[in-house]
Amino acid sequence: MHEASIALALIDVAGDVLREHGAARASALTVRVGQWSSVVPEALAAAFPACAEGTPLAGARLSIERVPGVGECPQHGPVELEVWRGLRCPLCGAPTPRLLQGDELELDQLELDQLELENL
C-alpha cells in the first residue's frame, strides 16, 4: 500500500505551507486524485489519520476530489476514459496518445486555523 507514503508526502508538503504562513496546524485539506494516478482514494483516506498522528495535521479532515481521466482521441478530440478500456477512445476504440487529465495527485486546498489557502 503506497498510499501511506503518499499520505506522508502530503503531510510534508502541508507542513511546508504551514511554516511558510506561520500557522501551527491545519484543520482540513483537499487533495485532487486522478483516475489514472495509481492511487486508491479509499486507501489514502484510511492511511491518512495514522500518518498524521503527532503532526500539525493530526485530526485534520481529508477530502479527496476524484479527477476523471480525459484523453485525446485523434478522431473525436477530448474523451472521458474508462479504466476498464485502458487508454482507448470509448467511441471508436482508437488509442489515445495523450492523457489530458486524470494523472493528478496534488494538494489543492489547506485550511489553516482561521485561514484558508487555495490552489497550492
UniProtKB/Swiss-Prot annotation:
Zn(2+) binds at C73, H76, C89, C92. The keyword Disulfide bond does not apply. One of its GO terms (molecular function) is nickel cation binding. Keywords: Metal-binding, Nickel, Zinc. It holds the Pfam family HypA. Gene3D superfamilies: 3.30.2320.80. Coiled coil: none annotated. InterPro entries: Hydgase_Ni_incorp_HypA/HybF_CS, HypA/HybF. Ni(2+) binds at H2. GO terms for biological process: protein maturation; protein modification process. Involved in the maturation of [NiFe] hydrogenases. Required for nickel insertion into the metal center of the hydrogenase. Belongs to the HypA/HybF family. This is Hydrogenase maturation factor HypA.
